Design a protein with these regions (language model features):
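Long, low-complexity, polar/charged, intrinsically disordered or flexibly structured peripheral segments
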Residues: 220-269
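Aromatic- and charge-enriched surface segment that lines or borders ligand/interaction sites
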Residues: 97-141, 167, 177, 304-307
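Surface-exposed binding/hinge segments that line
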Residues: 147-236
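N-terminal lobe/hinge region of extracytoplasmic solute-binding protein
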Residues: 27-28, 32-102, 254-255
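Short, well-ordered beta-strand elements
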Residues: 52-66, 96, 106-109, 128-131, ...
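Ligand-site clamp/hinge motif
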Residues: 111-113, 246-250, 274-312
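Extracellular/periplasmic solute-recognition and catalytic clefts
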Residues: 131, 135-145, 158-160, 260-276, ...
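N-terminal low-complexity, Pro/Thr/Ser-rich intrinsically disordered segments
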Residues: 1-34
Length: 312
């Protein structure tokens, strides 16, 4: 990254208001220096036109939480791998690299050493394995396993090889799996350290922990933090059960996205920058540039048109 960005970790600069925004993320502790918040090898995003600067707010109007806001929310989508701008070549994003075996039945995914979740916890290969084994394959979380993550009608095997390396073993060859990950609307990883405290298999007090927040059991807490991508469900724990999320100590689960949701109700959503975001620009500024994302929900088309015309 030093060659691409013409900078070193020691010269990375941060958003001057990042400590203020970090304080808005319920459950986050005080921030360490920016050099300690980035991976050893950050992703360098080289601007197409010019170097940006931190600040500003991006406003968006939508009908409702579940009504066609994908073009706005997709700006935050942060997959292991990503298509380039013309949907051609696939590049590593959250992942540092990947490699197939000769017959496309084993996929090794390597993560970035030092990468961290939005609360400062380490992001490791185990978070990918946990997503598949303890979320996708879990019969409570998914009574019917999502067919998308089967190969030839059978589940894959996910195993952690090291802190920064994991492997998918496929029952049949599927070279298109990496493209499927690049185009997936969700994330193929979950914060194991945070969520495992609500799984009885990892924590014998999982149910008690959740029940103290007014939830039925530990799995209800996992559901609270993970099932917000289905249009039939509330889009965030803040909307589902803000009181329970507050008692559990975190309004949203730790994320890797550039912005973190901190406010949500029937008529709006607001985000602030992720203080541990793993990207920098070619001038060594930690991304994202934009301070706030603000989405307002206005169901009446005429009112939306008037607001747009007024520059709101």
């Amino acid at each position: 990254f030093e060659k691409a960005g013409d900078c070193t970790i020691a010269t990375i600069t941060e958003n001057p208001k990042i400590a203020e925004y970090n304080a808005m993320i319920i459950g986050n502790s005080d921030l360490p220096p920016v050099a300690d918040r980035l991976p050893d090898d950050p992703f360098v995003s080289i601007p197409e036109r010019f170097i940006g600067k931190h600040g500003g707010q991006l406003n968006h109007l939508g009908n409702a939480h579940e009504a066609g806001t994908a073009e706005f929310t997709s700006a935050r989508n942060t997959n292991l791998v990503v298509f380039d701008d013309v949907l051609g070549k696939i590049y590593p994003l959250v992942a540092q690299s990947w490699e197939w075996n000769d017959d496309f039945t084993e996929l090794i995914v390597n993560t970035r050493p030092g990468h961290k979740w939005s609360n400062g916890d380490p992001f490791t290969a185990d978070d990918i394995t946990f997503w598949y084994n303890d979320f996708i394959l879990d019969e409570v979380m998914h009574p019917k396993m999502p067919a998308l993550w089967k190969v030839g009608g059978e589940p894959m095997i996910a195993e952690t090889l090291s802190e920064t390396s994991m492997r998918f073993i496929l029952p049949k060859p599927k070279p298109g799996l990496i493209a499927q990950m690049a185009g997936y609307y969700g994330a193929t990883y979950l914060p194991k350290k945070f969520l495992s405290q609500y799984y009885p298999k990892y924590n014998p007090d999982a149910d008690k922990l959740a029940q103290a927040a007014g939830l039925e059991n530990g799995y209800a807490a996992v559901h609270l933090y993970t099932h917000g991508t289905d249009w039939t469900d509330a889009m965030s724990p803040i909307l589902k059960d803000k009181d329970a999320a507050t008692k559990l100590g975190r309004h949203v689960k730790p994320m890797l996205e550039p912005w973190i949701l901190f406010s949500s109700d029937a008529d709006h959503r607001k985000w602030v920058p992720n203080p541990y975001y793993f990207m920098v620009d070619s001038a060594g500024q930690q991304l994202p540039y934009i301070d706030h994302l603000y989405e307002r929900f206005v169901p009446q088309r005429e009112v939306r048109n008037l607001m747009i015309g007024n520059g709101e």
